[in-house]
Amino acid sequence: YFKQAIELIDTLKSQVLSKELLDQISAQEKYIKNKRLLVFNEPILYNEQHNKILVDFKNIDTLYNFIYKVDDLQKFNHLKSDSLYFNYIKSQQPFQVLETALPNHGDYNNYTTEVLLPDFSQGYYVLVSSYEKNVTENTPSVRFNPFVVSDVFIVYKEFNENLELQLLNRKTGK
C-alpha cells in the first residue's frame, strides 16, 4: 500500500494545491520514505562461536556494523549513553567492520532479518550499527549494543543473609 500511496502523492504534487494540503502530502511522503533501524543482540555471547543479531529496518539497503573491543572492564561499564559511546569510538579504531546487504523490496515496509556475526574471543565489545558508512554524532540512526563474550555464567541465590554463588560453563553446564 505504501508504494501505491507514493504514486498517488506524486500525482497529487503535480497538481495545483493549497500550501496546507501540499504540506500534509509532503509530511505523509516523508513518513513513508523515512528510514528506520533497530538492532537487537544478546548481552552475553558464546566464546568462539557464531552469533547473530536481529535487525528491524525500513528503507535501508546496507547495514554497517563497527565492532570495538573494550579492554578495560571499568571503561566498558562506564559506557551508558550515546554521548559516552561517541566519545569512546572517536579515540578508537574498530576491531572489525562488517558490511551487510539487506533485502529491500522498494515497497517502504518494515522488515526483520538476522545477520550473522563472526566468532569472537572472550572479552568486552561494543557493536555500533548504522545505515551510514561514516558514523559521527550527526549520523541520524546509530545503534550502540554492548556485549560480553564468555563461556562463564554466574548463578546466585540468597538464603536469609547468606549469598551462594555458582560459576557455570554455559556450554557444558558444569
Specify the residue positions occupied by each region the protein language model found.
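N-terminal, cleavable Sec-dependent signal peptides of secreted/periplasmic/extracellular proteins
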Residues: 1-174
